[in-house]
């Protein structure tokens, strides 16, 4: 972390020499989203804020969804087996994609034959590891899908951070939190956690994992 901080500081200083009028953060931003600057993002996020803030407030005034069953005790070994199942559902070849455990989930790619993802198992929040696996699995599928002739070029590792995140969030949210996906996998989910979810319907589970709160973490 210290070395990354020093590199970031050096980049900000370097960029200030190139263009003293430019915001220092643009030096770092350009490393991840080439051609995008803070002025463009200010317009983008201002537009989002106008729609999202009232929406979140309106949802907050509605009756709260019961997600208490997600916070029962879920043994880690069962969560690990469930994570393996999710990787299988996603089509991740375990011969080319490993799964490890860490404090904060991340994906590490060496090439399109060796990508490794990690997750964190919360004893009292089964959705945490579930959606971390789907999220990091999305990153992994992107890396595993890069053509052989593009390996070790500037196009490997993702063309931008935004594009990479679009793939991970697609699997995590658009697929993983959809009613169709939950309905398809839920009988298997109940097999992994019969004591916790045996009397919980697929619709209840779907609503619980889509619960919106004013202040909530992105992942864990």
Question: Language-model segments: what does each one mean?
Answer:
Residues 61-62, 113, 145-152, 207-215:
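Short acidic (Asp/Glu) and glycine-rich catalytic loops that position anionic groups and cofactors
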Residues 2-13, 218-219:
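Single conserved hydrophobic/aromatic residue that forms the stacking wall/gate
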Residues 131-144, 165-169:
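Active-site recognition of the HExxH zinc-binding catalytic motif
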Residues 158-195:
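Post-HExxH zinc-binding segment in Zn-dependent metallohydrolases
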Residues 9-10, 14-126:
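Contiguous, non-catalytic segments that form substrate-binding/exosite surfaces or channel walls
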Residues 180-217:
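Long, amphipathic alpha-helical stalk/connector segments used for oligomerization, subunit docking
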Residues 143-166:
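Post-HEXXH active-site segment of zinc metalloproteases
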Residues 35, 58-67, 147-153, 177-186:
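Inter-helical turn/loop segments and adjacent helix faces that build the functional surface
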């Amino acid at each position: 972390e210290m070395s990354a901080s020093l590199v970031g500081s050096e980049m900000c200083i370097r960029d200030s020499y190139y263009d003293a009028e430019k915001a220092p953060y643009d030096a770092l931003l350009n490393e991840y989203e080439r051609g995008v600057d803070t002025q463009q993002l200010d317009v983008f996020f201002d537009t989002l804020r106008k729609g999202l803030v009232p929406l979140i407030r309106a949802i907050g005034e509605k009756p709260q969804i019961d997600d208490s069953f997600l916070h029962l005790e879920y043994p880690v070994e069962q969560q690990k087996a469930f994570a393996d199942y999710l990787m299988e559902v996603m089509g991740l070849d375990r011969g080319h994609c490993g799964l490890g455990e860490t404090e904060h989930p991340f994906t590490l790619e060496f090439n399109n034959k060796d990508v490794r993802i990690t997750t964190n198992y919360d004893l009292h929040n089964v959705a945490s590891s579930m959606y971390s696996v789907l999220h990091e699995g999305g990153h992994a599928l992107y890396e595993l899908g890069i053509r052989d002739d593009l390996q070790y070029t500037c196009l490997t590792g993702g063309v931008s951070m935004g594009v990479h995140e679009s793939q991970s969030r697609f699997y995590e949210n658009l697929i993983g939190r959809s009613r169709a996906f939950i309905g398809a996998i839920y009988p298997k989910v109940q097999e992994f956690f019969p004591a916790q979810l045996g009397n919980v319907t697929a619709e209840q589970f779907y609503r619980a994992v889509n619960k919106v709160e004013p202040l909530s973490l992105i992942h864990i």
